[in-house]
Amino acid sequence: KAGAMIGSGGLVVMDDKTCMVEVARFFMNFTQNESCGKCVPCREGTKRMLAILERIVNGEGEDGDIEMLLELADTISATALCGLGKTAAFPVVSTIKSFRDEYEAHIYQKRCPAGACQKLKQIYIVPELCKGCSKCSRICPVTAISGKVKEPFVIDQSKCIKCGACIESCPFHAIKEA
């Protein structure tokens, strides 16, 4: 439905659990690896675009990143010497055009609407549902969950590695992922 250009000669079907920013990062990584490196726009431009996309999917995106990606895309497309370089930025431009709101959510709200970007996931305990059984705390491999028995536990987001072990262990379904 979106009509986003991802590549040439192929059809890619995705659902709402697919992060379009990650898709753009994946294709830019592929392009960067396939670049022969002979022309500066392709070699350096795709490297810079990939670095920006990696920052965005890791929750470190900044104001101006979308505009910088579009500017780099225009420059690379106009100045690259080969077909790969001239089309390298198409997936990024297409995903920004059709899914700009996803880029903005990653950059400004530090969240992935598809829930696919690991670094942007939040695992939390709903205090009203937590019975304080401590099962989650005992199973956490990095001791990110603390609390007192029979009282709601809490997750230290700075320690949490988002493995999901606590979610599976909770018999009261008090641990959620956002």
Label the model's feature ranges.
Residues F27-F30, R111-G132, T143-K162, H173-A178:
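Ferredoxin-like iron-sulfur electron-transfer modules
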Residues R43-M49, A89, S137-T143, G147, ...:
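Cys/His-rich zinc-coordinating "finger/knuckle" motifs
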